[in-house]
Amino acid sequence: MKVAIVFLSLLVLAFASESIEENREEFPVEESARCADINGACKSDCDCCGDSVTCDCYWSDSCKCRESNFKIGMAIRKKFC
């Protein structure tokens, strides 16, 4: 019985690590060239890379990509870009 539990645990661990590896988000070269990193120049939220990064024009004349305080709302908004 203990052997079966250990075997099933290893099996679940193997599948979990494989699914995590498949879900890693890597930007293709073309997509990373189209979007700006943190502190990069932007005109709208869609210009910034990542689901939780927003275009911030509040503090200065030049807009820059910044980490958003509302990560869930920003992730939903980025789906429509």
From Swiss-Prot:
<keyword id="KW-0960">Knottin</keyword>
<feature type="disulfide bond">
    <location>
        <begin position="46"/>
        <end position="81"/>
    </location>
</feature>
<keyword id="KW-1028">Ionotropic glutamate receptor inhibitor</keyword>
<dbReference type="GO" id="GO:0090729">
    <property type="term" value="F:toxin activity"/>
</dbReference>
<feature type="disulfide bond">
    <location>
        <begin position="57"/>
        <end position="63"/>
    </location>
</feature>
<dbReference type="InterPro" id="IPR035285">
    <property type="entry name" value="CNTX"/>
</dbReference>
<dbReference type="Pfam" id="PF17492">
    <property type="entry name" value="D_CNTX"/>
</dbReference>
<keyword id="KW-0738">Voltage-gated sodium channel impairing toxin</keyword>
<feature type="propeptide">
    <location>
        <begin position="17"/>
        <end position="34"/>
    </location>
</feature>
<protein>
    <recommendedName>
        <fullName>GAMMA-ctenitoxin-Pn1a</fullName>
    </recommendedName>
</protein>
<keyword id="KW-0629">Postsynaptic neurotoxin</keyword>
<dbReference type="GO" id="GO:0035792">
    <property type="term" value="C:host cell postsynaptic membrane"/>
</dbReference>
<keyword id="KW-0964">Secreted</keyword>
<feature type="disulfide bond">
    <location>
        <begin position="42"/>
        <end position="55"/>
    </location>
</feature>
<keyword id="KW-1015">Disulfide bond</keyword>
<keyword id="KW-0732">Signal</keyword>
<keyword id="KW-0800">Toxin</keyword>
<comment type="similarity">
    <text>Belongs to the neurotoxin 03 (Tx2) family. 05 subfamily.</text>
</comment>
<feature type="disulfide bond">
    <location>
        <begin position="48"/>
        <end position="65"/>
    </location>
</feature>
<dbReference type="GO" id="GO:0017080">
    <property type="term" value="F:sodium channel regulator activity"/>
</dbReference>
<feature type="disulfide bond">
    <location>
        <begin position="35"/>
        <end position="49"/>
    </location>
</feature>
<feature type="signal peptide">
    <location>
        <begin position="1"/>
        <end position="16"/>
    </location>
</feature>
<comment type="function">
    <text>This insecticidal neurotoxin targets two types of channels/receptors. It reversibly inhibits the N-methyl-D-aspartate (NMDA)-subtype of ionotropic glutamate receptor (GRIN). It inhibits glutamate uptake from rat brain synaptosomes, and blocks GRIN in hippocampal slices. It also acts on sodium channels of both insects and mammals.</text>
</comment>
<keyword id="KW-0528">Neurotoxin</keyword>
<keyword id="KW-0872">Ion channel impairing toxin</keyword>
<dbReference type="GO" id="GO:0005576">
    <property type="term" value="C:extracellular region"/>
</dbReference>
